[in-house]
Regions:
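Alpha-helical transmembrane segments and membrane-interface helix-loop junctions
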Residues: 1-179
Length: 179
């Protein structure tokens, strides 16, 4: 189990670093948005490239932020059954949900979005807007984000199995109050 826990830790570290970068992307997206608006109103100049850059940063935040958010146990959840389960039952529910729903869905979506990226890359797809950006790099973010979320799912499965075997103590409880 130790090698698997080491793998889990490595995945967690990667997603923590991604989350750290995403924190700065929020600030960068806000600065780009505000600067673009101020320049447009002050000087009458606007750039589709800056607007698209802002969209790209938000897309990166969503796609890569999902794995970081999952690692931090901060995804929105419906706790109809979860609240009534013991801690062990919650671990089992997390394990089953991740193994049979999250990971397969992420891998399927990564697989289905890969040709979308490859086609854009093959033709060197550009924005249809004047002054717009290259499109294929942001299209790569879609399958990459789903792969990172699936990898975080693998990490969570490893941790849940270790916790069920008594080899690891994790706080699987969602810290926000339920409504």
């Amino acid at each position: 189990m130790r090698p698997l826990l080491a793998l889990s830790t490595a995945i967690d570290v990667i997603n923590e670093k991604i989350g750290y970068i995403c924190n700065f992307l929020v600030l960068a997206a806000c600065i780009v948005s505000a600067a673009n608006a101020m320049i447009r109103y002050a000087f009458g100049y606007s750039s589709n490239g800056w607007l698209e850059l802002q969209w790209y940063m938000f897309a990166i935040l969503v796609m890569f932020g999902a794995s970081y958010t999952f690692k931090r146990n901060e995804h929105v959840r419906v706790e109809i059954f979860y609240l009534f389960l013991s801690e062990r039952g919650q671990l089992w529910l997390d394990l089953i949900g991740t193994l049979f729903f999250l990971i397969p869905a992420c891998l399927l979506l990564a697989y289905l979005s890969w040709p979308f990226f490859m086609q854009a890359y093959a033709v060197g797809e550009m924005s249809g807007n004047a002054g717009g950006l290259v499109r294929w790099p942001i299209k790569f973010v879609i399958p990459a984000g789903f792969v990172m979320l699936a990898l975080q799912g693998v990490s969570e499965v490893i941790k849940r199995i270790a916790a069920l075997q008594g080899e690891l103590t994790i706080d699987a409880k969602y810290e926000r109050p339920t409504q």
